[in-house]
């Protein structure tokens, strides 16, 4: 099976450890991931520069994987990444990562589906009707 060029979307401050675990599972092309240092550098920039960076990253990828932690669905940049990936007709999927342990061995409560927040099409249907958000089997 071919590996996809993936852009991972997640709440950096709370879920970067969990995101690293997912990235290190080896299920996606290593060229598709960015380092924690990339986000550390870009998060200090203006909103316009952050959007530019996200747009550039998404343009190089075939799909968006949203790693859903306890409060991911309320995060500004995660929501922007979902909106932009939808506009660019990228594949989109979500994975609940609440069962993965952080660096202290702690798990968190399951977060709400971030795709539920988006209304699409003429009939204003919820994106969550079309985009799956899986539960991680890892813990």
Regions found by a protein language model. Give the residues of each.
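Structural signal for conserved beta-strand scaffold positions within catalytic alpha/beta enzyme cores
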Residues: 34-36, 94, 117, 132
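Conserved N-terminal substructure of TIR/SEFIR domains
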Residues: 1-60
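Conserved beta-strand-loop-alpha-helix hinge of the TIR/SEFIR fold
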Residues: 57-101
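C-terminal interaction surface of TIR/SEFIR-family domains
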Residues: 1-7, 14, 18, 103-139
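Flexible, active-site-adjacent loop/turn segments at secondary-structure boundaries
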Residues: 37, 48, 75-76, 113-116
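Short, glycine/charged-enriched secondary-structure capping and boundary segments
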Residues: 21-24, 79-82, 107-109
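A broadly tuned preference for mixed-charge, low-complexity surface segments
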Residues: 50-65, 116-126
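Conserved protein kinase catalytic core
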Residues: 42-43, 100-102
